[in-house]
Every structure is written in C-alpha cells, then in structure tokens.
Amino acid sequence: MPTATSDSVPHHVTDRLSDFSTNRRVLLLCALAVPIGAIGAVVSKVLIWLIAVFTNAAFFLRLSAEPVVLQGQHFGWWGVAVPVIGGLIIGLMARYGSEKIRGHGIPEALEAILLGRSLINPKVAVLKPVSSAVSIGTGGPFGAEGPIIMTGGAFGSMFAQLFHLTAAERKTLLVAGAAAGMSAVFATPIAAVLLAVELLLFEWKPRSFIPVAVAAVVASVVRVPLLGVGPIFPVALHGQLGAGALGLAAVVGIAAGLASGALTALVYACEDAFAKLPFHWMWWPALGGLAIGLGGLVDSRVLGVGYETIHGLMRGEFLATALISLLIAKGLVWSIALGSGTSGGVLAPLLMMGGAVGALIGLLTGVGDPGLWAMVGMAAIMGGTMRSPLTGMIFILELTHDFNSLPALMIGSVSAMCVTVLLLRRSILTEKLARRGQHIAREYSVDVFELMRVSDVMDRTPPTVSADTTVAALANRIARGDPAVAGRQGTLVVDEAGALAGIITRSDLMDVLQAGEADRTTVLDAGSTDLAVTHADATLHDAIAVMLKRDIGRLPVVDRDNERLIVGYLGRADILAAKLRRQEEEEKRERGPILQLTR
C-alpha cells in the first residue's frame, strides 16, 4: 500500500488560497456602514448638546444649550450638591433602567462583542448618552468619548439587527458605530479606525476593517455641518525635533507609563473600596459625586470634560505648581468617581493628566515648549493606560495637526506601553472584564493552523487493519500493545488491495465487545464507511474544520486524485503537536547557524 507523499504544495492548491478571507458581502457591510456613520455623527451632536443643557440647568439654573466652561467658576456649596444630585439620578437610572450604563463604556462594548454576539439592548442606546450627559453636566470629571463609543456601537448593533447578518458581521457594524462616534466627537477618523483595530475588532480582516473605515469617514463628513471643521485643539506648529528632544520624549513616555500604572491601580482600589460599603451600589455614584463636589471646591478644573484645560496644556499655559495641583486633584477625583460606578468616559481625563505629566517634565527640564511635552504626555498616557499606542499618537496628531511632533508622539506612546505591559498584566479597560472572569488576549499573530499543512504533522505510517479482521483479533492486538495499532484512537480499514475502505475507533470496538459479538463481527462491519477525509496539502485549519463539522477526532489523509489511496493519518495529538512546535519557537533559546559557519 503506497504511503509516500510530497511535502510540496501543488500550484493549483496555493492558487486558490488568498491573503485575506473575504467575499462580496463586504460590499453590503460597506453600504450599511454609510448610514451608521451618519447616525454616529448625529448621536455625537445630541450628546454634546445634552451635556450643555444639563450643565446650564445644574450649575446656572437656566434652560440653554450654549457651551459653558466650569473652570474658574466658583459655585460654593451648591457646586458640591450638584454632583451628588447627578449621582443619585444616575444610580436610579442604572438600578431601574439598565446596569450597562455604569462605567465608561468601552469595557461594556468589549463584553458585547466578545460574549454577547454583538447584541446590545436598545435601552442602552437611549440611557447611556442621557446618563453620561447627566454625569458630565453635573460636574463629573469625564469625557464624552467612552459613552459615545458605547452609544454609537449600540446604534450600530440595533441597525445590524434589522438585517439577516452573522454575529461576525454584526460585530463589524457595532464597531463601525463606535468608530463613527469617536470620529465625529473629535474629528479624528484615522484614530477612530486605529482604536477599532487595536481595541475592539480583535481581527485584521477586510470584512471588518473596510466598513469601519467607511463609517468613520462618513461620520467625519457629516460632522462638518453639525460640529464644525478644523482641528479641535489648534496649536502653534513646532519645528523639526533633534535627538535630544526625542530622548526627552522617551522620558515623558516612561513617566506617563508609570502614571498610567498608578492611575489604573487607584481606580480599581477605589472600586474595591466601594464594593465593601454596606449599602446598594445604586447609592455609590452619589458618594462619588460628593468627592467630585469637594474636589471642585479645591480646583474647579477637575469639573466637567475640561477641554479648555486640555487646550491650555497644549499651549503651555500652566506653571509647575498648577500642574502638580491639577494632576493630584484630577487623579483623585476621577478615580473615586469612576470607581463609584457612575457613567462617563476615560479619554478626556487621561489627556488632561497625561498632559500635566508631560508639561511638568518640560518645565522642569527647560527643553523646548511645555505644550509639546504636554502633547507627548497625552499620547503616552493613552498608549500606556489603554495599551493602544498607534491610536494615542495619531489621535493627538489629528487633534492638533502638528505633524512635526509625530516622532516624539510615537516615542512617548510606545515607551509608555512598554512600561505598562511590564508592570501590569491588564489595561484599565480589560481589568474590568477580568474581574468578571473574562480574560482577553489582545496579541495578534498568524494562526499556526493556517500556516501549517497536514503533511507537516501527519503520521506517515498510519495504523491499518484488513477489512476481514474480526473485532476480537484487533482488540487482542491492541491489548498486547502492538505498535502498529495500539498508539491511536482510530485504525484505518483497508481492502485486499490496500485501498481505504473505512475506519474503526476504540468506541466502535467497545460497543461490539460489550454486545458479545466480537468473534463474529469484522472491523469493516463495526466501523464507519461514511468517511470524512483530508489531504496532505490541506491546511490544518481546513482539517480541523472538517473534524468539527463531523464531530470526529481523526481523519484519513488521502491522495487528492485518488481518495482511496492512503498517504497518512491525522489525529488530535498530531494537531496539538503543531501547536507545541509553535510554542517552542516562542520559548526555546538557541544560537543561530551563523556562529556555526564561522567555526
């Protein structure tokens, strides 16, 4: 019986394989992404309008949607009461509306994507922006981006549910809505797409990437008549940076990375402290609101979104003492408020605190413009806290349009991520999911099962038995430890010419033995003749798909032109050996062949 096969992959096989798996349905997803992008922009406008309405009503006791600035204002004890009232409202909304509105939105979006088949309750689409507007409008030290990501994602999910789509396609449209929201709020379509890739999609496929990009671009276009055009935080452009400046960018990145670790630890320490309180979580946001109000008495810059403060940091307007005060006050108030389970985003507070770290280092060293180092600190703290360095550097670039700062932004963001991945096992976003028992691996790599062929791991001397052999005879050979058949859970059945006729498994043997028919039953009669097979040039991924579809643990490997000609045997152990081989490549240290050639 022939058992040899070539390791080379025929051209006709590689010719039908492609770099990406996609089909024409990507065009349908792109078409659906267009209205989702427009909806994301409109929802962003509504959220910003709601924040202004609640801020005017809460602090100035007037009905208006005019943008207002809380920084520099003094509200006395009324300024302490307002965040408490806001916290009470949010607690009631979460208790009797939907608990999903608690938190800053991105972990909830991740949970819906990974565990909820990308299905989001319509109540969340309504309650999340309203609760966030109440939180921020009553002084909450949060940004609008987390809630708008969750809200945009909710609308994307709801829209997708109107059509016959797979869960994977719904995920694409959910993320498209999230990216559209971020693109519209900040006029940062590239950063929105990068955030989707680094944080939300968990894949790099045209099916998902292209529709998300379409939604982000559409949102940025629709944004213009709604929210205006141009960079959100225009700054004086900086010149080309020298080697010394780039070295300082690494210092800022390391400092921001350490700050990221400290802030993450502080947030979850506060969350743990609230969890120990002897009353229902519905009341926690009100207690967090008390911390907000008291913090506002000390430094009013901790109140609200604080975009004016962020812009001031980018322009280098703060002295060292003011930066230290801002960093401590904002860090404490934000951590306590977020730990209380209220509603609001993390991005704007992180920008403010990262900017304070960078500007402070710039002032202390006296190198260049403190505003530049504030920008580097902002990119770095995003890269460190959210583990999204590409998003961090491009986000600041799109906010300012200062393209000469890109090398410094890149160095700072990557340096911060390096620090946090060494110090912390998880980011501020994934830690919340881990506390619910859900671990997320965010590393992308080539699937070893897509890369390796069946011929790389198959048994080239497959276990075989003649079709007329009795079950009793085969059972005796296995019991004696006959190496030709004892090492596998299945044995291939061959006819007189050595051609594949069937397969018999250990469970088939046990059924016949228990029935007392072993001496009168042949292996061909006891086994299966309705065979699923694979080929030596098939990928392990394809072979595994066949196993899963047929609910079997082993496959005969046959010639592609003659499916009765056996060339090998593939079992679960062979597949696991492929995974082990890739693991050894990651962990085994050895010298390369170049040293051997020089001896």
Over which residues does each language-model region extend?
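The conserved cystathionine-beta-synthase
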Residues: 465-488, 494, 511-516, 520, ...
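Generic long, charged, amphipathic alpha-helical segments
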Residues: 360-382, 512-532, 536-539, 543
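Juxtadomain coupling helices with adjacent low-complexity linkers
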Residues: 572-599
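Short hydrophobic beta-strand motif reused across regulatory alpha/beta modules
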Residues: 394, 501-509, 567-575
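Hydrophobic, well-ordered secondary-structure elements that form the walls
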Residues: 344, 387, 415, 457, ...
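Active/binding-pocket-proximal capping segment
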Residues: 349-358, 435-436, 497, 507-511, ...
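Bateman (tandem CBS) regulatory domains
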Residues: 450-463, 469-476, 508, 519-531, ...
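Alpha-helical transmembrane segments and immediately membrane-proximal extracytoplasmic
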Residues: 1-451, 455-461, 465-474, 478, ...
